[in-house]
Amino acid sequence: MINIRKTHPLMKIVNNAFIDLPAPSNISSWWNFGSLLGICLILQILTGLFLAMHYTPDTTTAFSSVTHICRDVNYGWIIRYMHANGASMFFICLFMHVGRGLYYGSYTFLETWNIGVILLFATMATAFMGYVLPWGQMSFWGATVITNLLSAIPYIGTNLVEWIWGGFSVDKATLTRFFAFHFIFPFIIAALAMVHLLFLHETGSNNPTGIPSDTDKIPFHPYYTIKDILGAILLILTLMLLVLFTPDLLGDPDNYTPANPLNTPPHIKPEWYFLFAYAILRSIPNKLGGVLALVLSILVLVIMPLLHTSKQRSMMFRPISQCMFWILVADLLTLTWIGGQPVEHPYIIIGQLASIMYFLIILVMMPVASIIENNLLKW
């Protein structure tokens, strides 16, 4: 008798995606982050759901409702901190996942890659709106500063900002709509992630060598299920270490002060995972120019397939490109550091140089390095 998992309409889908899926035999731990992102998303949806049961999206009570969750709700503190630090783990996995795609040339799967970029934008938007909800000082001023950037759009900018705010400043209407969007977006992300997976399974996974692996495939279960479980254990361990020992390590102390429109904090900055983009935004003295650079810093991922000039897909056998890649990583770390510093000398010039380097490495140095490597192959 044929196995039910291969015939049942629903189980067949799960079977083809997670059990009998043919997978390359040599994919490394860098391929674990997809499943870890799935776990992060499920964790965020669950903790978020329980937080939403006790949260009130109103300017007068939002801050107190978060305090109430932490003090009075059974295990509310752990749910709140798992949600806040879960976002950090989510972005760590996201950056690793995108970095893996860049290093091993996974962006040649165009549909999968482009949906991935949309997922990145959607996740960043969701995290930004979530940061506004506790209605602390940094929530309010972060929302004010970032939404205000849209006013740089010529002609429609000011009207657009007031439309998003639902008034003439960040207020009740803004908080309510941000809560609504923050609640619905993770489900849209989950749907997009399934489409992401659908397109990936059309082509099959890439592997570290970048060479087609059709001749050497192994079943996903048990080999990669057990590998994913190990990754999941390490993820949850790291998350719980953060939550239980240093829950406020990655947060901003200013957010423990209720939002006050009359008092601006000395240093307005977003959560750590946006600092690199924030540094690029601040490094350009012109408002519209800064906004464009901010958007392009992420949107540049879309043109990665066009910038691929190498004859090889992966960077595994390309030492010059490897150097460029790790310089880019160092540059992003530098930008992250600068984004958290005040706007003064020497941070301004470091930020400007790091921003120029970022675009220079991606748009010029990496394609040139690939061409040099192509020519070296002829020798």
From Swiss-Prot:
InterPro entries: Cyt_b/b6_C, Cyt_b/b6_C_sf, Cyt_b/b6_N, Cytb/b6-like_sf, Cytochrome_b, Cytochrome_b_C_euk/bac, Cytochrome_b_N_euk/bac, Di-haem_cyt_TM. Heme b b562 binds at H83, H182. The chain crosses the membrane at residues 33-53, 77-98, 113-133, 178-198, 226-246, 288-308, 320-340, 347-367. Its cofactor is heme b. A ubiquinone binds at H201. It is found in: Mitochondrion inner membrane. One of its GO terms (biological process) is mitochondrial electron transport, ubiquinol to cytochrome c. One of its GO terms (molecular function) is metal ion binding. Binds 2 heme b groups non-covalently. Keywords: Electron transport, Heme, Iron, Membrane, Metal-binding, Mitochondrion, Mitochondrion inner membrane, Respiratory chain, Transmembrane, Transmembrane helix, Transport, Ubiquinone. One of its GO terms (cellular component) is mitochondrial inner membrane. Heme b b566 binds at H97, H196. It is a multi-pass membrane protein. PANTHER family: CYTOCHROME B (PTHR19271:SF16). Belongs to the cytochrome b family. Component of the ubiquinol-cytochrome c reductase complex (complex III or cytochrome b-c1 complex) that is part of the mitochondrial respiratory chain. The b-c1 complex mediates electron transfer from ubiquinol to cytochrome c. Contributes to the generation of a proton gradient across the mitochondrial membrane that is then used for ATP synthesis. Heme 1 (or BL or b562) is low-potential and absorbs at about 562 nm, and heme 2 (or BH or b566) is high-potential and absorbs at about 566 nm. The cytochrome bc1 complex contains 11 subunits: 3 respiratory subunits (MT-CYB, CYC1 and UQCRFS1), 2 core proteins (UQCRC1 and UQCRC2) and 6 low-molecular weight proteins (UQCRH/QCR6, UQCRB/QCR7, UQCRQ/QCR8, UQCR10/QCR9, UQCR11/QCR10 and a cleavage product of UQCRFS1). This cytochrome bc1 complex then forms a dimer. This is Cytochrome b.
